[in-house]
Amino acid sequence: MTTSSRVKALLELTSTDQSTFAAAFGMTTPQAMSNKLRRDSWSAKDLAKAAELCGARLAFILPDGSQLILAPD
């Protein structure tokens, strides 16, 4: 599963509109988000921002259960 597939799944699971999502990334055309999804070009900062927009958090979960949560800042 690609990163873009996971982002699309996150949008679907949280009922987040793709155009609202694109606007939060500063994209003014639907084509810009489509291009990003097609290129599968996501930085850690992008993924943390996507998670935050959908009411989630992006984290590394270690074997001992401790978490390192990535913030979009």
What are these regions (language model features)?
Residues K45-I61:
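DNA major-groove recognition helix of helix-turn-helix/homeodomain DNA-binding modules
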Residues D40:
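Major-groove DNA-recognition helix of helix-turn-helix-type DNA-binding domains
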Residues S15-M33:
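Short alpha-helical DNA-recognition segment
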Residues L11, A22-A23, A51:
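The alpha-helix within a helix-turn-helix
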Residues K8, D17-T20, A48:
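Residues within the helices of the helix-turn-helix
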